[in-house]
Amino acid sequence: MRLVLFLNMGGAMNLQDCEVFLKNMFNDPYILGIKNRFLRKFVAWIITKARVKAMQENYKKMGGKSPLNELTQSLCDKLNLKQDEFKFDFVNLYVPPFATEILQKYTLNENDEIILFPLYPHHSCTTVTSSLEILQDEISKQKIQAKVKTIDIFYKNKLYNEMIVSHILAKKNKFDAKILIFSAHSLPQSIIDKGDLYEKHVKDHVEILKEKLKDHFDEFILAYQSKLGPVKWLEPNTSDVLANLNDKALIYPISFCIDCSETIFELGMEYKHLAKCDYDLISCPNDSDEFAQFILKYLSDLN
């Protein structure tokens, strides 16, 4: 068996999951950065209690759940129907399904292979490194003898970028904007200052896409969303960019592969009240045929 596991932070499937998500996320040493495990757990508890009600209210506006799990499951189902060389499944870091239960579903031996595929096109210790460490620890804990391969960044991949360009232009045909905003999930500047490659990868990716789209837009803007707390984060903020727009725009969520609360609620709903001009949101790759095609080609090229 060649088991491909997509890795993501996960999205709450109900309002009760919001507390689970926050508690696990802020207890991740790559997120909070407090080395002492007991102190980190205590601080995570305080932050969770302070934020959970607001998160639940946001989720109510999305129908009470994130679309991330269902879209990822749909992507796995589509890929499993298209071929029989790989078996596709997914693991979340902060809400179910967790690594323990997913790995226990399969009987694996030394002739099998596990391919860990974080659904993040750009590298960050807060996403890719954290995901891979948790999975590799669980594989070791369960004494699984299968060979393990890992996928890292894929933002430079030609097929992946052709898909993005296609999705952007398809939306532009329906909403003719001259400004394209690339919105990436922000990170604290302190993480970047320690050598995290995320900002560099995102900027490189924007340059690749600008070159492919230069004949279709007059202006390209890279902005960062989802800032949290009083510390310095990557700038400019997407909300500030929208508040100062002088013409309508399209937004592409460049750091996301699957739609989640940050895209559906934050970009699609919350920022609408802040925007000076009208804008439209382009969906993530999600379970599209083009994304499935990219994944299969990418995996076949690994061999």
Curated annotation (Swiss-Prot):
Enzyme class: lyase
GO molecular function, one term: metal ion binding
Keyword Cytoplasm: yes
Residues annotated for Fe cation binding in this entry: 185, 262
Subcellular location: Cytoplasm
Protein EC: 4.98.1.1
Record key words, sorted: Cytoplasm, Heme biosynthesis, Iron, Lyase, Metal-binding, Porphyrin biosynthesis
Pfam families: Ferrochelatase
Catalytic activity field: heme b + 2 H(+) = protoporphyrin IX + Fe(2+)
GO biological process: heme biosynthetic process
Role: Catalyzes the ferrous insertion into protoporphyrin IX.
HAMAP family: Ferrochelatase (MF_00323)
Family: Belongs to the ferrochelatase family.
Protein's name according to its UniProt entry: Ferrochelatase
Source species: Campylobacter jejuni subsp. doylei (strain ATCC BAA-1458 / RM4099 / 269.97)
Gene: hemH
